[in-house]
A protein has these predicted regions:
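Long, contiguous binding/interaction regions
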Residues: 1-30, 35-149
């Protein structure tokens, strides 16, 4: 199913900003969370094309209702002398977890929506960033809104 979905996006010239695939509570199904952009008409076309794929069981646009979305990021930052305490304090403010410490760096784990992670990056000096990696977004409807097949 993954190759068919990616092939559809590629063939039609649609852009995938992020893509996350993981098992669900049903061992026979995986859940794909795709983040893409486009006008309402483009999103409608993407949804129609996805629904036509045999491997696709259901398509839900999470932006059509209340939802929770989250991204995971690991960021390695320089941490020497006075920078160390500042990095630790900034990580604490954003509820990050320091998962690795060396004499010259910290690796910080952060989760949250894209805006929160971007705000963290904006709050530290760009020259302090040594390396960054992010997952694609994952999302789920709020409250009683569930994806059931």
């Amino acid at each position: 199913a993954l190759s068919r979905v990616v092939g559809l996006f590629s063939a039609r010239g649609y852009n995938i900003e992020t893509l996350t695939v993981a098992p669900t509570e049903d061992a026979t199904l995986s859940r794909m969370t795709i983040v893409t952009t486009g006008s309402d008409d483009v999103i409608e076309q993407i949804t129609k094309h996805l629904n036509r794929l045999i491997e696709v069981v259901k398509v839900v646009d999470l932006t059509e209702g209340a939802n929770i979305d989250s991204v995971f990021m690991l960021i390695k930052v320089r941490g020497v002398s006075k920078e160390r305490e500042e990095m630790k304090r900034t990580a604490d403010i954003f509820r990050g977890c320091i998962s690795d410490v060396t004499e010259k760096s910290y690796t910080i784990e952060l989760t949250g929506n894209k805006g929160k992670l971007d705000a963290f990056i904006d709050s530290i000096e760009r020259t302090a960033i040594l390396e960054t990696v992010r997952t694609g977004g994952s999302g789920i409807g709020r409250g009683e809104r569930i994806l059931k097949v």
